[in-house]
């Protein structure tokens, strides 16, 4: 069970890094293109916000479970 949680946290960490790199690239592209926003970028932004929200919720749940196991009471 611990190995599974460890791998989930690892994937969460990698996903966070990938999202930050994508945001940096998009920021650089906007500076070059005069900050034009297309429908595709809007959809991508909605998807990224949804993924970020889900990742925050998963992290919160994992931290709550970890806190329960450490303190011994839930």
UniProtKB/Swiss-Prot annotation:
N-terminal signal peptide: 1-22
Major site of localization recorded for this protein: secreted
Expression tissues: Expressed by the skin glands.
Keyword set, alphabetical order: Amphibian defense peptide, Antimicrobial, Cleavage on pair of basic residues, Disulfide bond, Secreted, Signal
GO-annotated cellular components: extracellular region
Record's keyword annotation contains Transit peptide: no
Keyword Secreted: yes
Record localization: Secreted
Record-level GO BP terms: defense response
Top-level taxon of origin: Eukaryota
Disulphide-bridged cysteine pairs: 68-74
Residues making up the propeptide: 23-42
Function: Antimicrobial peptide.
Family: Belongs to the frog skin active peptide (FSAP) family. Brevinin subfamily.
The protein, known as: Pelophylaxin-2
Species annotation: Pelophylax fukienensis (Fukien gold-striped pond frog)
Organism lineage string: Eukaryota, Metazoa, Chordata, Craniata, Vertebrata
């Amino acid at each position: 069970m611990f190995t599974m949680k460890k791998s989930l946290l690892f994937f969460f960490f990698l996903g966070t890094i990938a999202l930050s790199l994508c945001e940096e690239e998009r920021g650089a592209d906007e500076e070059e293109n005069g900050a034009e926003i297309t429908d595709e970028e809007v959809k991508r932004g909605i998807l990224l916000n949804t993924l970020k929200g889900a990742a925050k919720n998963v992290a919160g749940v994992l931290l709550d479970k970890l806190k329960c196991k450490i303190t011994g009471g839930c």
